[in-house]
């Protein structure tokens, strides 16, 4: 561990690209995973302020996202990891339990499955995904995204994800990477343009596709669910183009 920390110390922080790193940081926090699946998770150099801000987001999301797990280790994580975390955060535990309601989730076959829903702060997920997009760009391609560069998150409905993927021309993003961490705990696909190198697209699926939905769905209508999350990065002048791609 000391060797790894020394390896990154003194480099620019992969998240802010301005401060010098003081440590290394898992792009996807180790506690998202079962202990047996925490080996060889991707790391980046990280400064203390970014490490602290990112850890605050992770503390909430590690405790909440597991409730929607659909991957192979979902039950084990729900029974072992989450209770320990919520015991240390009684306020969050009470808030989640108070918001829990029965619901029906429509499957791909058209059948409805009984489940439960809880309140979720999506702004924390969006903030963490911005860190993740920056971290993955550095980890795979050595790209530092400047503070002024565009880093944008999209959490479209599942139909929108399919349409979005069809619009991304492989010829414009010839550099590709895919990874499966922790036997399906985190699966991501990355795409990078030849020029500029900061133009990247990331598709991320966690916990087998945690299903998120809006609480603004009209009564009597099926909720529009989202299980794939996207991060777009690029120079500031491409911000408008990235926004159009998200739509």
Go through each PLM region and give its residues.
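Histidine-centered nuclease catalytic patch
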Residues: 12-43, 54, 59-60
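Polybasic, low-complexity binding patches
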Residues: 52-91
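Residues that form generic nucleotide/phosphate-binding pockets
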Residues: 64-67, 85, 89, 95, ...
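Short, charged surface segments at domain edges that flank catalytic/cofactor-binding sites
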Residues: 1-12, 127-133
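C-terminal, charged low-complexity interaction regions
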Residues: 114-247
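Short, charged/polar micro-motifs that form catalytic or ligand-binding hotspots
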Residues: 3-6, 37-40, 118, 122
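Short flanking/linker segments adjacent to small metal-binding domains or redox-active Cys/His motifs
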Residues: 83-122
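Zinc-coordinating Cys/His ligand positions in small cysteine/histidine-rich zinc-finger domains
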Residues: 47
């Amino acid at each position: 561990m000391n060797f790894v920390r020394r390896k990154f110390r003194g480099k620019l922080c992969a998240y802010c690209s301005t401060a010098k790193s003081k440590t290394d940081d898992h792009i996807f926090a180790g506690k998202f995973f079962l202990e047996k699946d925490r080996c060889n998770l991707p790391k980046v150099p990280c400064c203390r302020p970014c490490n602290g801000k990112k850890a605050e987001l992770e503390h909430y999301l590690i405790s909440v996202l597991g409730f929607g797990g659909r991957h192979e280790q979902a039950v084990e994580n729900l029974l072992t990891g989450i209770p320990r975390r919520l015991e240390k955060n009684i306020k969050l535990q009470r808030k989640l339990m108070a918001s829990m309601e029965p619901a029906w989730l429509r499957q791909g076959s058209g059948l409805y499955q009984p489940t439960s829903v809880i309140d979720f702060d999506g702004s924390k997920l969006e903030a963490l995904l911005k860190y993740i997009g920056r971290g993955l760009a550095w980890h795979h391609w050595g790209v530092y995204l400047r503070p002024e560069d565009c880093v944008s998150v999209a959490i479209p409905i599942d139909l929108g994800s399919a349409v979005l993927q069809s619009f991304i021309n492989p010829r414009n993003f010839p550099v590709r990477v895919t990874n499966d961490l922790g036997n399906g705990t985190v699966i991501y696909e990355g795409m990078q343009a030849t020029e500029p190198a900061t133009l990247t697209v990331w598709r991320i699926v966690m916990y087998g596709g945690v299903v998120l939905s809006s609480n603004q769905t009209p009564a009597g209508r099926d909720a529009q669910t989202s299980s794939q999350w996207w991060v777009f990065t690029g120079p500031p002048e491409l911000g408008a183009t990235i926004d159009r791609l998200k739509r």
